[in-house]
Curated annotation (Swiss-Prot):
Recorded family membership: Belongs to the TatB family.
Source taxon at top rank: Bacteria
Family annotation (Pfam families): TatA_B_E (PF02416)
Protein name per Swiss-Prot or TrEMBL: Sec-independent protein translocase protein TatB
Gene: tatB
Subunit and interaction comment: The Tat system comprises two distinct complexes: a TatABC complex, containing multiple copies of TatA, TatB and TatC subunits, and a separate TatA complex, containing only TatA subunits. Substrates initially bind to the TatABC complex, which probably triggers association of the separate TatA complex to form the active translocon.
Function: Part of the twin-arginine translocation (Tat) system that transports large folded proteins containing a characteristic twin-arginine motif in their signal peptide across membranes. Together with TatC, TatB is part of a receptor directly interacting with Tat signal peptides. TatB may form an oligomeric binding site that transiently accommodates folded Tat precursor proteins before their translocation.
Molecular function terms, GO-annotated: protein transmembrane transporter activity
Topology in the lipid bilayer: Single-pass membrane protein
Organism: Cupriavidus pinatubonensis (strain JMP 134 / LMG 1197)
Keyword entries, A-Z: Cell inner membrane, Cell membrane, Membrane, Protein transport, Translocation, Transmembrane, Transmembrane helix, Transport
Gene3D superfamilies: 1.20.5.3310
GO terms for cellular component: TAT protein transport complex
Chief site of localization: membrane
C-alpha cells in the first residue's frame, strides 16, 4: 500500500491543522478514520472472497481428478472380473450356471430374509419396553406410567400433610 512514516504523517497533520482548522480537525479525522477502516474491511472481504473462489476451483479440480481415477479403477475392476468370469466359464466347459440349477442367483432367497423383510428392521415399542426386566426399570427410575407433575406430587405427598379441599 502507501508507505507512510512518522514524519510524513506529522507533515500531513500539520497541513490539515492549518487548512481545516482546530475546530473541525477532530471531526474530519474521525470521518477519515472511519472511511479508511471501511476501505480496509472491504479490501479484506474481497481478498477473502478471491481466496475462497481459488480454493473452490482447486477443490473442483481435485474432485474431477478423483472421479476420473475412481472411474478408471471401476473400469479396470469390471474388465478383470469379466476376463476372470470368461476364463472360468471356458475352464468349466461353457456350462451356464442358470441352465444347470434351473434359475439364477437372484432366485435363491435365504429363510431369514423373508422374516427380516416382515419387520423392515423395526421392532415395536412394546417389544423394546418389555425387553428390560422390571427390577432394572425400578432401579433406574424408568417410568412405567406417564403422570403429570401434579399427579406425582399428590402420589408421593404424605397422607397426614395433605390439605383437604372443599370438594373432597
Amino acid at each position: 500500500m502507501i508507505d507512510l512514516g512518522i514524519s510524513k504523517l506529522a507533515l500531513i497533520g500539520a497541513v490539515a491543522l492549518i487548512v481545516i482548522g482546530p475546530e473541525r480537525l477532530p471531526r474530519v479525522a474521525r470521518t477519515v478514520g472511519a472511511l479508511v477502516g471501511r476501505a480496509q474491511r472491504y479490501i479484506n472481504d474481497v481478498k477473502a472472497e478471491v481466496s475462497r473462489e481459488v480454493e473452490l476451483e482447486e477443490l473442483r479440480k481435485m474432485r474431477t481428478e478423483f472421479e476420473d481415477a475412481a472411474r478408471d479403477v471401476e473400469r479396470t475392476i469390471h474388465k478383470e472380473v469379466s476376463e476372470q468370469t470368461q476364463a472360468l466359464n471356458e475352464a468349466l466347459g461353457g456350462i451356464e450356471p442358470s441352465a444347470e440349477s434351473g434359475g439364477g442367483v437372484s432366485d435363491f432367497v435365504p429363510s431369514w430374509h423373508s422374516a427380516h423383510k416382515a419387520h423392515n428392521g423395526r421392532k415395536s415399542w412394546r417389544v423394546k419396553q418389555g425387553a428390560r426386566p422390571l427390577w432394572f426399570k425400578r432401579q433406574n427410575n424408568v417410568r412405567v406410567w406417564v403422570q403429570s407433575g401434579a399427579a406425582r406430587v399428590k402420589r408421593h405427598r404424605p397422607a397426614a400433610g395433605r390439605a383437604r379441599s372443599f370438594f373432597e
